[in-house]
């Protein structure tokens, strides 16, 4: 980690049925940039819908932000109507171009591209098994393990490499075998995973049984070559894995080709908004959605045990996203309201640490009756990828990223709301920043409970020994950061704000769903 925050591993997107699929993936990835800033990539099938004959998948990926990796020329070369895209922040696997996604597996006459958000807990075991069977790897990423496992299962199912996209009955049989390979793989991998997978003529989304990482489905009006969407009728029937071999159409939107809507699968609803799409629903935990030119199919490969990462609502997700029916902005606002009720203090102004602390600060101000002021400005041009080689330089980065508005703070008793305290280094620098701006008192309030345990399911976290709340009591932390008072929201209060208790709370209580 290069600063005192948790980082999500990745953002994923898949587009099906749009002439400019790569460009739409670019827009969607830009909306998901907050989920990963180390690398970006897009894969596209050039003729996947109109004709699978001779179709191929092209790939462009590199280190850096979306806007740095892709030029207009890149996007023009990525021509096609099926696409997957990825932004990455590493947890499993190093920060190298070899681990950038999408991963592509090419055969004689066919290819598979895969994007993954999350982290497997059994990837080392699976990798060893695959290597014993002759598989080779080009990266240290657990995501490549998923891709190689799908290929292995496809071959074991009788699928023919190089012929899944030829016409006739054999092609349909191979498509069924490939979907079954994805179902089998999803049942073998353990941990957190939200996947976007594509072949030359198919897009697949997969969400793990606990739904730890978010994944949602939307539609983009226009379809191929601007065709208007057909009126589809949704069937409520959902096929099991055993029934899949008999019929690939589970919950489907029956449409008459070629009049169909373009579809998008993405980590957050903000990506659907970025391509002017319409949100349809979240994928359920343990669900696979298959998109072909015939429409949508849904396969329930495992029973849902909903445990969405609670930190999506605290910090990771964009405030304009809605995850599993809960508005991120509203959740943060309600956390602030509860925090004000639980930890009131006399003060003159309330401020929020940009960006994820602002929603909670607004809620705190409303509930407490204390005025909200801006107080802190964030430098928008400092990326999260800045690597400071020493701890002292990392701590000093807060003065580059943030600056105080003296007229808002001078002579005031200030309540500052942040989303979390991880190591405590950023919090200490924030208090120094506010006092330097003339704040008479600084009362630190945190809209999440104390982070006491590391995450093993797709978040870049320090070791337990580096987490200040695991080694210090509340008063000790207050002294360490230099605040006049310090309080965290309770876990009970946080769940009250969210209106549910269907979350992974491992970083707070050490209890993990996997």
Regions found by a protein language model. Give the residues of each.
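PRPP-dependent phosphoribosyltransferase catalytic core
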Residues: 201-202, 276-282, 301-303, 432-514
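Serine residues within intrinsically disordered or low-complexity segments
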Residues: 51-52, 163, 228, 235, ...
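Conserved short alpha-helical segments that host acidic/polar catalytic motifs at enzyme active sites
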Residues: 1-222, 258-284, 290-347, 353, ...
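A conserved beta-strand->alpha-helix junction
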Residues: 70, 139, 144-149, 372-383, ...
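Secondary-structure transition/capping motifs at alpha-helix termini
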Residues: 135, 156, 344-348, 366-373, ...
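Short, glycine/charge-rich flexible loops or terminal/linker lids adjacent to PRPP-binding catalytic cores
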Residues: 369-415, 425, 452-460
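Intrinsic, low-complexity polybasic segments
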Residues: 159-165, 223-230, 235-242
